[in-house]
Amino acid sequence: MNMNFSFCSTSSELSYPSENVLRFSVASRLFSPKWKKSFISLPCRSKTTRKVLASSRYVPGKLEDLSVVKKSLPRREPVEKLGFVRTLLIDNYDSYTFNIYQALSTINGVPPVVIRNDEWTWEEAYHYLYEDVAFDNIVISPGPGSPMCPADIGICLRLLLECRDIPILGVCLGHQALGYVHGAHVVHAPEPVHGRLSGIEHDGNILFSDIPSGRNSDFKVVRYHSLIIDKESLPKELVPIAWTIYDDTGSFSEKNSCVPVNNTGSPLGNGSVIPVSEKLENRSHWPSSHVNGKQDRHILMGIMHSSFPHYGLQFHPESIATTYGSQLFKNFKDITVNYWSRCKSTSLRRRNINDTANMQVPDATQLLKELSRTRCTGNGSSYFGNPKSLFSAKTNGVDVFDMVDSSYPKPHTKLLRLKWKKHERLAHKVGGVRNIFMELFGKNRGNDTFWLDTSSSDKARGRFSFMGGKGGSLWKQLTFSLSDQSEVTSKHAGHLLIEDSQSSTEKQFLEEGFLDFLRKELSSISYDEKDFEELPFDFCGGYVGCIGYDIKVECGMPINRHKSNAPDACFFFADNVVAIDHQLDDVYILSLYEEGTAETSFLNDTEEKLISLMGLSTRKLEDQTLPVIDSSQSKTSFVPDKSREQYINDVQSCMKYIKDGESYELCLTTQNRRKIGNADPLGLYLHLRERNPAPYAAFLNFSNANLSLCSSSPERFLKLDRNGMLEAKPIKGTIARGSTPEEDEFLKLQLKLSEKNQAENLMIVDLLRNDLGRVCEPGSVHVPNLMDVESYTTVHTMVSTIRGLKKTDISPVECVRAAFPGGSMTGAPKLRSVEILDSLENCSRGLYSGSIGYFSYNGTFDLNIVIRTVIIHEDEASIGAGGAIVALSSPEDEFEEMILKTRAPANAVMEFCSDQRRQ
């Protein structure tokens, strides 16, 4: 038998079998003794040699003739009917895995154990599956790439081949792997389908119990895939059980009029049902991918193995817009329970665990210790660097993780106290929030100040603004820059500069990165809830600043290919804060101090300054130190880093990656720059907030870094309130405002009904549900608002809201780490998308695509997404912009959207510089 092996860096380099090539069996080449060693020794996640394609023009034989299948694994002892089901959930580096986790946690009665596909060797998997009998079934997640690339699929192929007596459900990539491992061909779909809905017909298989079928039913599913199983290549062992309905794929809005989101079940519909027996006896009715050169009318959406309890679903049951998704997972649980109930054998050993709902895994402490040790010495792919992300298990009501040595020692804590004063109906009497900032903090061009500015006139989008400057004894400024990778071995490491209120400085080298430092700092603070329980807002002092996009390396993302010239994170510890309630017009003055120290005079001093402004309600205070702009610079326009042709070529590259299954959506960006000389950042921000007000706007100035941010961001990244509720509000879908009311309404409706924009938004909603699902209580993640259209001064945007209740043992910083960078700026799956974007974008994004906001001393936070923002570093102003690339994108339209998003902040800079020149 002649076998050829070729290395490929992406699945786009795969050459799929032509029609005249005979079907081959994957098993013989993946697990033959000769090849097995080279397969296992491949370096996982390597960009150069991470994938292997084995190809052969020889048919090695039928599946049942393979020696690997004849290998005898010990059969597992069945138990009495299970009251709960323990699932091993294999994560194929996807961004939707924890949506499955959330669903299974509530349906199974216990959370699943999540491992990535290269974290366990076969020997480790064998131990937990067969010796410890730790799991009742296996679910294989979606993921980027192809099952033909070992680095994309990891251990999953071997599990599918050898675990014949364990129920397995493969979703999307897992579905394709089930087909591929038994000899079916995985080929390009007639068209990539991502974030779109299809009607489904099924054959009445038990996996679809209590789920209707057919065109007239309300069973609609969300699809995220570019590859499919070629139905004509299905071996006799695999049975088709579901397929798309011809010409019934469209957008969410097209289907939503009759589709309840996440319906959990209803009586079976009137759709056509084809018995399994008929499929086994007569396969001729099943259409091929291409018949006589014509495009297939149906796409295979579900398969099952005729002998093993193995199932595959090409669509995504975990998506927010898939109906009956919960019912599908419930049916798989029932399949598992019934399977083990039927497996009666008195000759086999009994399970070595107590079958009770309190004990989720056998010898849980030892298992977690082993997992923790693996992650500390392994490939760094674990969630949060410790095993807490894998389990939320409890043994006899005690958190299992408390039995394992904690990764983080408890720091010594200091008690901070809060004093505050409220002045009712004061803001308008002193000229509003602008006058308040200019009087209190606007002198000296706003150096070392912050202003979290809800400048939108719509109070429903943002009620409170917060501001402050160099404060009391607790004030300090943090400036962090990641190290060059050539200098250190840790990709997280960097240099931190700390400046206190007396201008003394201290330098530290942070081996574990900035977020770990911030987590420890916040953990060292204790507080008395009575100090702030009557305040109507959450920020009462603490860290205020910005996190750059490159901090993604501290959040499980790959090594940065580019380094930013600006700092990667800058924060103040603000002990003195002024807050404005825009809804009630109240002003609050707040001051933090350490227990046992003298209280500051900030409350009284600030009160006197505010009272002195009484009567200035109609006059705006100006900064008297505004410099004159060089006339040669005032007329300079912003220059994009990439030309129109280069950007369009990058969009086309993104679409090729999407077609080949490497990503569902890629958020491509570029930078636009111009020299700004000695222009005043605060004056520029005041101009920007008038021209383009936004609910998550901000001004930050860090004088020792020569850095200012003037942001008119409309997007919230993530918020955590005092009740432990996390909220994300991603924006995906943007269109310009109309010049007349009629045109404006038409454009708004056009955005709302756009299939492309709905697909973009849905993909990011599912991604954010996944990110929150990693740190939220099972069953608590929900979507109160899906694809709402919000209108701003220059654009309409499509916005969704995702919420979930934070687990009590998860820190605020770990919540951010789980979701950063914001999915609306990366695409999905996030990890692979970030890798691709880093290869296409020719420079660091810097602070653009990162976050601005606060981490309050009381454990709350609120962060925006840094978009529509002018970043001034040294003498250069930069504006980042881009858009989400999907299969439905038009390269030319994507370039125009990028320019549209740049226009408002760029025009504000041009106008401001021109005005200053005239002065």
Swiss-Prot record:
Database matches in InterPro entries: ADC_synth_comp_1, ADC_synthase, Anth_synth_I-like, Anth_synth_I_N, Chorismate_C, Class_I_gatase-like, GATASE, TrpG/PapA_dom
Role description: Bifunctional enzyme that catalyzes the biosynthesis of 4-amino-4-deoxychorismate (ADC) from chorismate and glutamine. In the first step, a glutamine amidotransferase generates ammonia that is channelled between the binding sites of glutamine and chorismate and used along with chorismate in the second step, catalyzed by aminodeoxychorismate synthase, to produce ADC. Required for the synthesis of 4-aminobenzoate (PABA), an important component in tetrahydrofolate biosynthesis. Does not possess ADC lyase activity.
Name of the featured protein: Aminodeoxychorismate synthase, chloroplastic
Record note on domains: The PABA component provides the glutamine amidotransferase activity. The PABB component catalyzes the formation of ADC by binding chorismate and ammonia.
Active site: 172 (nucleophile), 316, 318
Segments for region (PABB component): 436-910
GO BP term, pick one: folic acid biosynthetic process
Known pathway: Cofactor biosynthesis; tetrahydrofolate biosynthesis; 4-aminobenzoate from chorismate: step 1/2
Enzyme Commission number(s) of this protein: 2.6.1.85
UniProt entry tagged with the keyword Zinc-finger: no
Organism: Arabidopsis thaliana (Mouse-ear cress)
Membrane-crossing segments per the record: none
Entry's Gene Ontology molecular function annotations: 4-amino-4-deoxychorismate synthase activity
